[in-house]
Regions:
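A contiguous, basic/glycine-rich beta-loop/short-helix subdomain that forms a polymer-engagement track
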Residues: 185-208, 220-227, 318-440, 444-449, ...
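Conserved pre-motif I regulatory segment
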Residues: 37-73
Length: 641
């Protein structure tokens, strides 16, 4: 790695290029000197455990690439210790870290690792969780409102002195714990009479590690509002396989007939002209009739202006001043100051200002039949590139990034250092069987094939004790399989409950709360001598973010390959867009997307170094694309039957 320079007073490290611009520490003004040992292996002063060789390799790459100001895309298996290893490399530099992740469970894991480092090294590294008002606000008047409305209500309450919690913090209160999650922020702030939300924002500019959900990092407006500056900082994108989807979601928007109706009513109550909104509502209702329809952005903008009866910029100028009046009018009546007009204007502004060659519009309806217009970003690099340009160094890491070359092309990180690391589990603790006798390909999805799949699932469940996870391509297909397997006697009903190979079968819940209860019941049954089976779907609640350690998942069965619906207009548009960017990239993306979902489900079965699992991949197409299966899942090589 390039020789680093370090402040002898506070330990802050800089690259040679940064020192050439300024020879004094940007934090304390002390003259910068060459780091001892060239600046490498600083992690040895911080890492709280005895490292495995694979972790040493990973940390060496983080230091040589990310610390030096580059971008590293790293794939390493579940249980690898990626979080603590990354923190151990970056903390010694003294440079702030923004750590972005997907779920609250993953946020808590990052904070626990900082605490583990502090305990093991008697250190005082500080970390804070940036979270939404919904989690941190303790004023009921605004905490449950949508983001944009909550911001405005909060501003108004503070300007009028009507919020009892202090938000203008000149300095950070003394005596705070070094690591602050949501619960600690709320309790500590309440005790001091300050606002937890603004306390977290104040701390974010002072601490070494800021842990934030993905939208806080990817959404430019949220970054501005929260003061989350990436310049000169390390950026860690954990669960990096989500980067493309999250980036596209942040840069996309939708418009519903319900929103337009509510916005029209808001403007009516202010006694202002509603013709543009009424014209837009009629246009949306007409355009969404029939089958889903794609529309090019330029054509969409033209049709929107015809429906509005004016140019989009003129409509924005005319109606933007009404947003504040709508909120004030609602609040004066004791109503929640949600402004639907603002949502319409934000949608129109996106259509007007977006790079149209990277977008597409889609007219369709919601499941309840309501008209819906989506304006979809097709290029995830539009969200990723600004982050990489602003941050000092970037680490994108996940257990499921394969195929790495396609992933980096899709997200625009072709200049990054890319690496996949060996698993920390012994290869003989991971077994894989690929059944080429079966497939879920639509043309071959006969009753006989479904029963053959059922026999394969039954054989898998018989071969391992305790818990078995079974993933299906779609919920409807899962229910069809269960019905057909019950008819064939593969699944038996015992006291009204389905059983497979003597194990009780549980089905993924219909919503988050129901699923949580189902998973808890499954886990209790899985660790008993009789064991249990959990039926779930790829890309569902149990395929990502859920943990099934030890006996909770001794077997994982993939029934089919989770290709996206090729008939979906947005899928077709995405394939066509990537094919325009680079010949064949769209088709590569389509396959990568399926195998990424499969790899993510495989990851539920291995949660630590001493864990073990047997994988069954029930579809001949897995054998045709062996190179797309994450290396850590292959053990000593798949057995093909």
């Amino acid at each position: 790695m390039a020789r680093l320079y370090q402040c002898p007073r506070c330990g802050f490290q800089v690259t040679p290029q940064e020192r050439a611009r300024d020879r004094f520490c940007p934090k304390c003004g002390t003259y910068l000197r060459p780091a001892e040992g060239g600046g490498g292996e600083g992690w040895r002063r911080v890492f709280p455990y005895e490292p495995y060789p694979q972790q040493v390799e990973f940390m060496g790459d983080v230091e040589s690439t990310v610390v030096s100001g580059g971008t590293l895309v790293a794939e390493a298996c579940n249980g690898f210790g990626k979080t603590v290893a990354a923190l151990s490399c970056l903390l010694p530099t003294g440079r702030p870290i923004v750590y972005a992740t997907r779920t609250h469970e993953q946020v808590a894991q990052v904070l626990r690792e900082v605490e583990a480092i502090n305990r093991a090294r008697s250190a005082g590294h500080r970390a804070v969780n940036l979270a939404s008002r919904r989690l941190l606000c303790v004023n009921d008047e605004c905490r449950l409102l949508p983001l944009r409305d909550a911001q405005e209500v909060c501003r108004r309450l503070r300007s009028r002195g009507e919020c009892p919690y202090e938000s203008d913090l000149d300095r950070v209160p003394r005596g705070l714990p070094p690591v602050l999650g949501v619960r600690e922020l709320v309790s500590q702030a309440r005790r001091r009479g300050v606002c937890p939300y603004y306390l977290s924002r104040k701390l974010a500019s002072k601490v070494e590690v800021v842990v934030a959900p993905y939208p806080y990092v990817f959404n430019p407006s949220i970054r501005r509002l929260t003061g989350l500056d990436l310049e000169g900082k390390f950026l860690v994108l954990d669960e990096g396989h989500n980067v493309d989807q999250v980036g596209q979601e942040v840069l996309s928007d939708s418009l519903t007939e319900r929103t337009l109706a509510a916005a029209t009513q808001e403007v009516q109550q202010l006694q202002r002209p509603t013709q543009p909104l009424e014209g837009l509502r009629g246009y949306l209702e007409e355009a969404c009739r029939g089958s889903p329809r794609l529309i090019a952005p330029g054509e969409l903008a033209q049709e929107l202006e015809e429906a509005l009866g004016a140019s989009i910029p003129r409509v924005l100028d005319e109606y933007a001043p009404l947003v504040e009046r709508v909120r004030e009018a609602k609040q004066s009546k004791g109503q929640a100051p949600i402004c639907y007009l603002n949502g319409v204007l934000i949608f129109l502004e996106l259509v007007e200002e977006s790079p149209r060659e990277s977008y597409v519009g889609l007219f369709h309806t919601t499941p309840s039949g309501a008209p819906l217009l989506e304006y979809r970003c097709l290029d995830p690099s539009l969200a990723v590139a600004p982050l990489v340009e602003e941050a000092h160094g970037v680490l994108v890491m996940s257990g499921t990034l394969s195929p790495l070359e396609t992933f980096t092309r899709v997200v625009g990180l072709e200049g990054a250092v890319v690496k996949s690391y060996p698993p920390i589990q012994r290869s003989d603790r991971i077994k894989m069987t690929i059944d080429t006798r079966v497939t879920t390909a639509y043309r071959e999805r006969t009753k006989a094939m479904i029963r053959r799949l059922g026999k394969s699932v039954e054989e898998a469940a018989q071969q391992v004790d305790h818990g078995v996870l079974v993933f299906f391509t779609q919920k409807g297909f899962m229910k069809n399989c269960l019905a057909e397997w019950t008819k064939a006697g593969i699944v038996e009903l015992r006291r009204g409950a389905p059983h497979l190979a003597g194990k009780r079968v549980f089905l993924e819940g219909r919503d988050a709360q129901h699923n949580q209860r189902v998973v808890e019941q499954y886990k209790r049954a899985a660790v008993t001598p009789g064991g249990a089976v959990l039926f779930s779907v790829f890309r569902g609640r149990n395929s990502e973010g859920s943990n099934f350690p030890g006996d909770q998942a001794r077997g994982v069965v993939l029934v089919g390959v989770p290709y996206a619906n090729y008939g979906d207009p947005l899928v077709k548009a995405q394939i066509a867009y990537f094919n325009r960017v680079r010949r064949g990239l769209g088709n590569q993306w389509y396959t990568m997307d399926a195998f990424r979902a499969a790899n993510q489900s495989l990851g539920r079965g291995i949660r630590g170094r001493d864990d073990w699992c047997h994988y069954w991949l029930l579809d001949r197409r897995y054998h045709q694309h062996l190179d797309l299966i994450s290396e850590w899942a292959k053990g000593q090589g798949p057995q093909v039957v």
